[in-house]
Every structure is written in C-alpha cells, then in structure tokens.
Amino acid sequence: MSEAITGAERYKSGVIPYKKMGYWEPDYVPKDTDIIAMFRITPQAGVEPEEAAAAVAGESSTATWTVVWTDRLTACELYRAKAFRTDPVPNTGEGTKTEQQYFAYIAYDLDLFEPGSIANLTASIIGNVFGFKAVKALRLEDMRIPVAYLKTFQGPATGIIVERERLDKFGRPLLGATTKPKLGLSGRNYGRVVYEGLKGGLDFMKDDENINSQPFMHWRDRFLYCMEAVNKASAATGEVKGHYLNVTAGTMEEMYERAEFAKSLGSVIIMIDLVIGYTAIQSMAKWARKNDMILHLHRAGNSTYSRQKNHGMNFRVICKWMRMAGVDHIHAGTVVGKLEGDPLMIKGFYDTLRDRHTPVSLEHGLFFEQDWASLNKVMPVASGGIHAGQMHQLLDYLGEDVILQFGGGTIGHPQGIQAGAVANRVALEAMIMARNEGRDYVKEGPQILEEAAKWCTPLKLALDTWKDITFNYESTDTADFVPSETASV
C-alpha cells in the first residue's frame, strides 16, 4: 500500500522522503500507454529499496530535493513517475561477492515526453538521476515502449527487406570487412584495400569509427577512391557492392555535405558513429530515408556505459532507441569474437533488432513484451575477432539476417586481401549449401569447411592460420536468471 502523504500536509515546506511524496505506488497498474523503465538499483547503506526506487522515479520526472508549491499548478498526480515494484536481483547480497541489488520498475505517463525525440526521452530517463546520491549505482536494464509512442518515430530508413532487394542478395548473411589499418593509409592505398575485398567476394567494405578527415587522407579523397573501387568490383563480379562511407564530422552541416557527396558518387550506404549523439543520428536517419540510402551505425563509445553490470545502461536499450531513431545497421556482438558478448545476452540484442514482436525472455534479458508495430527491422552487424573457421557457429548463433564482418579475418590472410575475401565467401557458401541440404551444419561444421578447403587454397590457409585462435574470457554482462559462460571456439 502507498505511504504517500496527501492533502495540505503534502505541500508544506520542507523535505519529505520520495516514498511519501507519491513516487512509490505499489498498487499502481501501468496503462498500455505508459513507458516503463526497469532499473538495476544498488541503494546506499540504510536506504530502503522502495525509497531508492521512488527517488529514481522522482528525479527522472517531476521532483526536486524539497517540496515546491508550484506542484499544485500541475496535474502532478498524473505527471509523477510511479515506482510500483522492486525485486531482489538474483545472486546479489548476503552470501555473494556482490552488494544487494534490486530491479525497480517505474512507469511514466506518455505526456511527459516529446513525440519522436530520443533526446527528450533520454533527458528524463538517463538524465540527472545517474548521479543521484540516494543510489550507489544505477543501471537502466530495459524499457517497454508503448505503440502510441513508437508510432511517433520513423524507424529504420531502409529495413532488412528493402536492403536485400536493393542488393539482390537473399538466403544468406551478408559479408563485409573493415579496412585495416584503420588510420594512416593514403586515399589510393585505402581504395585498393576496398577493391581487393569486394573483388574477392565480400558484399561490403567499411570505414572504421575513427576515420573521418585527417591530414593523411581527406574525406573527399577517401570517398572518390572507395567508390572507384566499388564500381570496378561491381563490374568485375556482376554483383551490387557497397562501402560504408563514414560521414561523421564535427557539425551537422559537414555531415550533410559528406552524405550528399556520397550520394552523388552513387553510394548505396553511408555510416555514422554512435558518439555523434541521438539528435544527429535521427537527423541523418531522416536524410537517409529521404535519399534512399542505407544507414550504418557503428556503436563507438557504447561500452563506456554498457559494459559494467551494476551501473550505466544495457545495450539492449540502445538497440531499442536506435531502432526507433532509424538506423539500418548496428554492431550488436558476435558471441565468438574478441569483444564482450554473452550468448544469451546477444540473442536478446538480435531479437530486439529483428523481431516484429518480442516476448518476455528473462534468460535473454528481455523483461518486457514489446510490440514493434510497423517499424522496420534493423540488420545486426557481427564484427571483431571472427574468422572463416567459425562460420558454422556464426550461422547457428546469429541466423542469416546479419552482416558478418571479417576485418582482420580478411585483410590478415597470408595470401592477401582478395584471398581472405575468397576464403570467407567460400566458407559461407559451403555452410549455406550444407544447411539447405538438410545437413547438421553445426555438428559437421569443421568437416564441411575442410571439404570446401580441399578445392579452395585461400580457405585452407585461413583455417590453418586461425584454427587455434580463441577469445574465451568471462563476460561481464551475463544473464541474471540463467548461469552462462562465454562461448569458446
């Protein structure tokens, strides 16, 4: 039962605990139109979990540190966020190595948020509250976004279905690679790397997150050399090819200029970095839809707030926001690569990006049922420490609506870049054929690759070079409800 103070007592000057100010309502039944956020809270010593949850609700909606009489000039009972449930987090507290943590569920009325604005949504949900003294640590784990609010967003500019139609590529994952080294190449040498990768069988090549316009290579030179490579590789192979031209810059005006130049050169795709901010991302997504351009997002900077389990924000929330904002691609983990990624958590990320309707799945970190209405699907990108010898695992874990990006696994091939691309394309085609023939490609994966390598020297060399490479480290972000270990290869 709520312990809120009501009537004249509620508006007397002074400080009242958030729990008694109306921000804790255990009997509250969320409306279909409410936005619900689920936080992982570590309260300060001596602070009840309900008070900590109420404090988060208050500070992320209408409250300040003391009673203000101007509350009476608003429909404050409506506009207050309402913490309505707290649950102890499994495997925390007494008898464990971790302080006691709680899952806190908070409902927000839809009228608290500007339609179609990720910036306004985040200003409340992850604004001042993360520095609030009442909690020792705070992490946003998941959100339920009502359809009424989703419909105010554009969603992905292109979507998976239209992207495949434009590329004329179906029934398999797409293949890509990031140009390496990411910094230092001249424009001409950079373009040569792009050509070799595409000519060898990749669908895409990619700029890395921090290649923009530096003294060693101006952005315009890079665009010209890359598109020359794309056009030559397309003519040589008869396939539609692309290169993610990174238009990230210091101002929106510069980003629009670079995007327009990419369009004028015939590019099918441009790229931006997560660090440009939510408003800039939405702006570029609107431009991309207007100009029939695929929009790739590199999640640069994400791990600064998503990697630690007790504070920050789970990547699944970023996945939801970016689908709303309108990107077509986003890096979402590999399971078997060099970057952080628990198998169960990554399944939750991929489902969030690709499903029309996401059911509750606690083992995958999905705490809310989510109807995505008519928003397009996002194509997840798997990159970072993957190679041809893992192809059966990648197909099994990630499915076919994914882009597999083999950067070092292409450019580091002992016979060169084109041979590295050939190895990856042959490995993928062999695995897809085995799957389509009804073979158990997961169990027989190594054998399938060895059979293909008998007539493909680049694949044989790739398997020999990287067969013993593993990144078997413990994940920091694991499921709370199902014990799991990072996959080994």
Swiss-Prot record:
Residues found modified as N6-carboxylysine: K206
InterPro entries given in the database record: RuBisCO (IPR033966), RuBisCo_large_chain_AS (IPR020878), RuBisCO_lsu_C (IPR000685), RuBisCO_lsu_C_sf (IPR036376), RuBisCO_lsu_fd_N (IPR017443), RuBisCO_lsu_N_sf (IPR036422), RuBisCO_lsuI (IPR020888)
Enzyme Commission number(s): 4.1.1.39
A GO biological process held by the record: reductive pentose-phosphate cycle
UniProt keywords, alphabetically: Calvin cycle, Carbon dioxide fixation, Lyase, Magnesium, Metal-binding, Monooxygenase, Oxidoreductase
Residue positions binding substrate: N128, T178, K182, R299, H331, S383
Disulfide bond annotation, renumbered to this chain: none
Catalysed reactions listed for this entry: 2 (2R)-3-phosphoglycerate + 2 H(+) = D-ribulose 1,5-bisphosphate + CO2 + H2O; D-ribulose 1,5-bisphosphate + O2 = 2-phosphoglycolate + (2R)-3-phosphoglycerate + 2 H(+)
Positions annotated to bind Mg(2+): K206, D208, E209
Molecular function in Gene Ontology: magnesium ion binding; monooxygenase activity; ribulose-bisphosphate carboxylase activity
Co-factor binding details: Binds 1 Mg(2+) ion per subunit.
Site (Transition state stabilizer): K338
Cofactor(s), names only, from the UniProt record: Mg(2+)
Gene3D superfamilies: Ribulose bisphosphate carboxylase, large subunit, C-terminal domain, RuBisCO large subunit, N-terminal domain
Active site: K180 (proton acceptor), H298 (proton acceptor)
Subunit structure as annotated in this protein's UniProt entry: Heterohexadecamer of 8 large chains and 8 small chains.
Other comments on record: The basic functional RuBisCO is composed of a large chain homodimer in a 'head-to-tail' conformation. In form I RuBisCO this homodimer is arranged in a barrel-like tetramer with the small subunits forming a tetrameric 'cap' on each end of the 'barrel'.
Family (UniProt): Belongs to the RuBisCO large chain family. Type I subfamily.
PANTHER family xref list: RIBULOSE BISPHOSPHATE CARBOXYLASE (PTHR42704), RIBULOSE BISPHOSPHATE CARBOXYLASE LARGE CHAIN (PTHR42704:SF17)
Function: RuBisCO catalyzes two reactions: the carboxylation of D-ribulose 1,5-bisphosphate, the primary event in carbon dioxide fixation, as well as the oxidative fragmentation of the pentose substrate. Both reactions occur simultaneously and in competition at the same active site.
UniProt-recorded name of the protein: Ribulose bisphosphate carboxylase large chain
Species annotation: Nitrosospira multiformis (strain ATCC 25196 / NCIMB 11849 / C 71)
